[in-house]
Amino acid sequence: MKRTTILMAAFLCLFSLTESPAQNTHKNMELLNLTQEWDKTFPKSDKVNHSKVTFVNRYGITLAADLYAPKTIFGGKLPAIAVSGPFGAVKEQSSGLYAQTLAERGFLTIAFDPSFTGESGGQPRSVASPDINTEDFSAAVDYLATRPDVDAERIGIIGICGW
């Protein structure tokens, strides 16, 4: 009886020290090597501030994004748009151009690389998964909704070709 109690207590202690995958999401967040210089296929706008951001989808994959914000903001929170390109494309191409152009028109935007693509994480590389890419959009909207400069009631998405 005493031995059973000790074994049960040891098991419970061990079990309580482990974490579920959901609890461990941010500890296992991939460290991405993000390019800081302008590396787009289009010219940089002088009307927009640009920065790199990352966020994690529900599969624990870290996504890389370019954030574009208008330099001139007329008070209040901004409407926001998440943009991603055709399957296999990266944010330095058309989705970045769309995002920058929309930021020039007053939106806060992010252009992101889907899972397994570009600067985003995930294995195997260079594959497209419509189910996971849909989750990537959901994670992008969730990320935008947490920003203090975004109106969470006015967030949209644009999927270019293939979406």
Give names to the regions the model predicted.
Residues 20-22:
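Boundary at the C-terminal end of the N-terminal hydrophobic targeting segment
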Residues 88-100, 114:
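The serine-hydrolase catalytic nucleophile loop
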Residues 76-86:
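Short beta-strand element of the alpha/beta-hydrolase
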Residues 101-121:
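Conserved alpha/beta-hydrolase
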Residues 127-148:
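Alpha/beta-hydrolase active-site loop
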Residues 28-76:
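N-terminal cap/lid segment of alpha/beta-hydrolase-fold proteins
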Residues 149-161:
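Alpha/beta-hydrolase fold nucleophile elbow
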Residues 93, 116-128:
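Glycine-rich "HGGG/HGxG" loop immediately N-terminal to the catalytic nucleophile
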